[in-house]
From Swiss-Prot:
PANTHER family: DNA-DIRECTED RNA POLYMERASE SUBUNIT K (PTHR47227), DNA-DIRECTED RNA POLYMERASES I, II, AND III SUBUNIT RPABC2 (PTHR47227:SF5). Gene3D superfamilies: 3.90.940.10. It catalyses: RNA(n) + a ribonucleoside 5'-triphosphate = RNA(n+1) + diphosphate. This is DNA-directed RNA polymerase subunit Rpo6. Pfam families: RNA_pol_Rpb6. The gene is rpo6. SUPFAM superfamilies: RPB6/omega subunit-like.
Length: 60
């Protein structure tokens, strides 16, 4: 697996898009404690664990 270095803008876009998906009812991919209910916090945890199913395609 290739790990890309993301810019802060790409990171914000990925976390924001995933948080929106979670807020709209998408299933959470990882197990989290029941007291974490904020979609942004959940998306950040998923991002840190590298499990967000979103890919980045850059134009070169």
């Amino acid at each position: 697996m290739i790990f890309m270095i993301l810019t802060k803008f790409e990171k914000a876009r990925i976390i924001g898009a995933r948080a929106l998906q979670i807020a709209m009812g998408a299933p959470v991919i990882i197990d989290i404690s029941p007291d974490i209910i904020d979609p942004i916090d959940i998306a950040m945890i998923e991002f840190e664990n590298n499990v967000i199913p979103i890919t980045i395609k850059r134009n070169q």
